[in-house]
Regions:
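Short Gly/aromatic-enriched secondary-structure transition segments
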Residues: 68-80
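Positively charged n-region of N-terminal signal peptides that target proteins for export
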Residues: 1-5
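Sec/Tat signal peptide C-region and signal peptidase I cleavage site
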Residues: 20-24
Length: 187
């Protein structure tokens, strides 16, 4: 009986030790651990960002000068990233053509640039279902209170529908993109 108890105790300890490993494995499975793509130009070399393109399925945001990609960033999206945003609280990132229309240096996240969602069409769709389309969709950095846990956000979809980048990337986007810049968000 004592051998059985020893084996049972060992098994219990092994299971308890494996639980954090299983959790970490689950997080890593959701994360994109690839190295980010090399940037093509130094900030001083970039004369104009004429538009921003987001490809949700690729988890990429591109700063464009005409047809040239001048910057590319790995992004995080809403917790429910597939499909167009339909209503407030659906945790989806909208799809379509919008404008980056204003910015907030003092937001709850490290800097934010507002996307002009909802459009008139977005309002009509939500209204047809008796729903509020939501709003306050932004490109932003990490939460201001993230502290030493910034690494935990990398590669995960964690926003309520916004497009998130690292704080360093947000500094660069903030510098390179002007208010009034068009943004196209694709599936």
């Amino acid at each position: 009986m004592s051998i059985f108890r020893a084996l049972l105790s060992s098994l219990a300890l092994l299971c308890m030790a494996a639980a954090p490993t299983a959790f970490a494995t689950e997080l890593l499975a959701k994360a994109d651990t690839r190295m980010p793509a090399a940037t093509m130009y130094e900030p001083a070399d970039i004369q104009n960002v004429s538009r921003v393109v987001v490809r949700k399925g690729e988890r990429r945001l591109y700063l464009m000068d005409g047809e040239d990609v001048v910057r590319s960033y790995r992004i995080s999206l809403g917790d429910n990233p597939e499909g167009h945003k339909l209503y407030e609280g659906d945790e989806r990132t909208p799809e379509g053509d919008y404008t980056l229309d204003w910015r907030n240096a003092e937001s709850d996240f490290y800097k934010s640039i507002h996307i002009s969602y909802p459009s008139e069409r977005d309002r009509e769709l939500a209204s047809a279902w008796g729903l509020n389309p939501g709003g306050s969709i932004m490109i932003h950095g990490l939460p201001n209170d993230v502290g030493d846990m910034a690494f935990a956000y990398t590669g995960l979809d964690w926003t309520d529908g916004c497009i998130a980048v690292t704080n360093e990337e947000m500094d660069e986007i903030w510098q390179l993109v002007s208010n009034g810049t068009p943004i196209s968000i694709h599936p």
